[in-house]
Amino acid sequence: MRICFFCNLIEFKPKGNVLQFFIMLRALDRKLEQLNSRERKRYAFDCVLPFSFRNGTGGFHFSHVRFHQSDDPTQTILSLDRKNKYDFIFVRGRNDAHKLLQHKESLSQKLLYLATQYNLQDPYIMGRTDYLFRNSRMVFFQTEPNAERYRRYQLNKGSYSEQELTRKIQVLPQFVEPSRHPLKMRREDKPLHLIMAGVIRPRYGLAVAAKAIQLIRKHSPKARLRVLYPSIVGTYRKRAQQLLRMPGVSDHGQKSMWETKEMIVDSGIGLALLYDRTSDQNPSHSYLSRILEYMALGVPVLTTRTVGNLALLGEDYPLFVEYAFDIQEKYMRLCDPQYYEEMSQYVKERGKRFLAEHAVEPLWDALHREYRLGTKK
């Protein structure tokens, strides 16, 4: 099986889309490592990137994936395909997949498209999404709710049978990379802190979190809101910087994936708010990578009730919040060690499937199932 992977990343940065892509590749690399040398020869995995990736960057070491830097990724993929005759070409991103097919439409027989988002209210976006769906072997969505929503959309259009949609629509969630070393557990005698990790956007509720820590500190004066982020959305920068300077808020800036894991465990309570005011509610159908990280580490997460979070945590999850005083109330409950342990075990059990070693299995199976179908044609 020969696969070329492409993601239009400008640089390596410890943020969601970058980490998702590299964690997936690393998980596939580990799958190849588990094979004996004879079996491994049946596979060839290449990856084209706009920047030069140095093996080991960010803690990502590869033994069986070959990286190619290119200023013109589309032409490089076409050239590599002529040379290697790939079985699949995996592309993350709507515009890049579309551009590839515009250069060579016959690649639709090989295209695996990772759809990161779509908007049912936008005719242009849906036109491109539907074109890619028609002209690909499989389309991967990052969450069950988004995959199901698109499946219903196609069923209503009547262009595909349920059987065909079941084969062609797959779910490829973000993976959580396992820790390299056992993490030092938080001592019970230490105060619980809130931690927010990830890109800062207006919809992620930093103002609500900052207000919540003021309320919490009236009863627990040593508690902090720790904020880790690779970037701040430009239009929100001034307001975000004001909030990051508020009493009780600790601005930690950008941390590596490994440092972030350590700080999450040391803090004790994950915070992941989402106030989605988009017309299509696409963010609400997503899984925030920070929530998956908290869950996999067994750190209780306070989060808003969205379609995606209901799929992750269950209808009856007791730590859904909306307002600052909700966060304060849940924080006080989690100060009970027995309750904290119950919630820790609950999220850890539900987060297990996103650990890379488990999450890669459905992808591995889907690739081989589709590969076998191709060899029969």
Predicted regions and their residues:
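Glycosyltransferase donor-sugar binding loop
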Residues: 49-51, 224-238
